[in-house]
Amino acid sequence: MKLEINNAGALRLARGQTLKMLDAAGSTICAREGTVWITEENSRKDVVLSPGACYRVGKSGLTLVQAFADASVSLA
């Protein structure tokens, strides 16, 4: 699957598509459209973001962001 960036600069994820982020501690992930699931390596909690919600990655290592349905996220 290819990654797309929409006109607002958000990364589009198709349903079920997973974004792998390495050593992203301190990065902020914001759901712009759709709902996404986030899990961090060696963390006991997972996070689900609805549109408008943001999450700051707290750990280095692997972070996965997966779209439940078509979604878009911004990264900062």
Place the predicted regions along the sequence by residue:
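Glycine- and small/acidic-residue-enriched microsegments that form turns, hinges, and capping elements
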Residues: L13-A14, R32-T35, A69-D70
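Regulatory nucleotide-sensing modules
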Residues: G9-L22
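C-terminal structural segments of small proteins and small subunits
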Residues: G52-A76
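Glycine- and acidic-residue-biased ligand/ion/polar-headgroup-sensing regions
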Residues: A24-V36
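Short alpha-helix capping/helix-loop boundary micro-motifs
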Residues: E4-I5, E40-N42
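Short acidic-glycine-tyrosine-enriched beta hairpin
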Residues: A10-L13, S43-G58
